[in-house]
Structure formats: structure tokens, C-alpha cells
């Protein structure tokens, strides 16, 4: 079984669409998705600055578009045809994962990511909040310190890698007095994602999600909530919406990949973060970070 992974916000890089736009039909596809997202994704994915694509309202649809453009090309080449796959996406990457697993159409996925990004950006503007990575330290001590500061472990990505989220004043205190043997690194995001600070985004996102045609997953699809498979369209969409204010348990997704004895891991663009975690947590399992069309041909040997 091969794991297909869709990255989340923070993975975006300047020019990440450039190599993909050389493919037949890619420019037309991005033009259609640009219309759906009400953004010029071609420009944003080729010539826009790092600062511009860091904007939550821009980054989320751009990342989903990059992932799905690569997945469409992979499907066109039939590289993994006939092979069993298990699909997971990190945070906004879940939307792309839903499209890969057949729950929603790719066009709807990009439009939904645009709504999600816009609604979350508005929520971020209501109060100064943020996120910081806590690297290392004893997990129990780290979680205890976060609780003391009224911070939330918004992302639990892997052993020794927890992302704290909450008010900026509390994050500053965490950086000044971190848990023993832990380092704290502020993340360049606009707010405390996957916490109750995102509650103002729920109504708008839920309304957009409710208007999308859905189908039951055609592949094993994991939830960020608990790392377990979601088996119906209704459950999948409920989970997707509620995930805005709930922690991302990528560590549990990784545990499920281990239980399913995956034989290879493919991370779609903008790739690097999730395949890096997989190499550390699932030692011995080949992990490929797809960054350009040339990387797709190498997947034939998986």
C-alpha cells in the first residue's frame, strides 16, 4: 500500500507552480481554478514574492492547486495504476486529500480552500494570536507548560515536535521560558490555527462545504482529528469543517500508516515537510517528495 500525502500551510515556496505549468493542459487547468478561487494562481505560483504567498487567503488555495495539479499528472501517467493507496493531508492539505480520495471534485477543492483561507484570515484579524513550534523536551512537560500558559497543542506532528497556538503574549512567555531541553521557534502564520480562535471562520466555511457535491471515499482516507479512516462523505465533511478549531494529530496519521504497513510514501508539492517526518518516523519506508514533473517518473519503481 502506498501513502499519498498532501502538505499544509507553510510548505509554499516561490515559483512552485513554474515546472508544472509547462505540462500540456496545465495552464488551462490553473486558469479554471483561478476563476474558482478568484485569485490569479498562475502569477501567485510563479512570480509572486514569499511575503505575498504567505498570506493565509492566498497560501491555502495555492497549495491545494499545486497538490492537485501534480496528482492529476500522476493519474494521467498511470504510474500508480492498480496499486492500493491510503491518503492523508495536513491541515488545509486535507481538502486536497479529499479530492484525491474522490470525496469532492478538484475544482470544488480549490474553491473551498479559497473560502477556508479567506475566512481564517478574517478570524486572525480579530485578536493577536500565533503559533510556535516546540522542538524536543519531554512531551508531558511540554504539554504541562502549554496548559500553564493557556496555549493549545494545535499540531502534534511527531515525537518531539508539537506546535503551540494561542495569544502572542503567551507565546512570548513560552519562548522566554521554554520547557526543559526544548527549543521554541515562532512560525510565520497569521494566527492560532486549529484552536477556538478560528471559531469565527466556521460558519462561512461550513456554508461553502454544504454546497459541494460529495461522494464516499474511493480510497482509504485518514482524518487529522484522530488519524483514523473516514468511511462516508457525510462523516468526512463534518470532520473537515470541525477540524478548523481542533488540533491536527499528524502523529496519529503516521501511526495509522505504520499499522497499514505502507510500502512507500509520496508527498505532493509543495513537498518536503511530510516526507521528512515520514523518513524519521517510518524508517525504512521509501519517501518521495514530488517537487517537479520529473519526480513523477521515479515513482514507477515504488
UniProtKB/Swiss-Prot annotation:
Gene Ontology CC, one term: cytosol
InterPro entries with a match to the protein in the record: Ac_transferase_dom_sf (IPR001227), Acyl_transferase_dom (IPR014043), Acyl_Trfase/lysoPLipase (IPR016035), Mal-CoA-ACP_Trans/PKS_FabD (IPR050858), Malonyl_transacylase_ACP-bd (IPR016036)
Residue intervals passing through the bilayer: none
Result for mutant: residue 173 to A: Nearly abolishes pupylation and dramatically stabilizes this proteasome substrate in wild-type mycobacteria
Gene Ontology terms describing biological process: fatty acid biosynthetic process
EC number: 2.3.1.39
Pathway linked to the protein: Lipid metabolism; fatty acid biosynthesis
Pfam families: Acyl_transf_1
Domain of life: Bacteria
Catalytic activity: holo-[ACP] + malonyl-CoA = malonyl-[ACP] + CoA
Keyword Membrane found: no
Keywords of this entry: Acyltransferase, Fatty acid biosynthesis, Fatty acid metabolism, Isopeptide bond, Lipid biosynthesis, Lipid metabolism, Transferase, Ubl conjugation
Cross-link Isoglutamyl lysine isopeptide (Lys-Gln) (interchain with Q-Cter in protein Pup): residue positions: 173
Additional observations: Was identified as a natural substrate of the M.tuberculosis proteasome.
Family, per entry: Belongs to the FabD family.
Protein name per UniProt: Malonyl CoA-acyl carrier protein transacylase
Taxonomic source organism: Mycobacterium tuberculosis (strain ATCC 25618 / H37Rv)
Gene: fabD
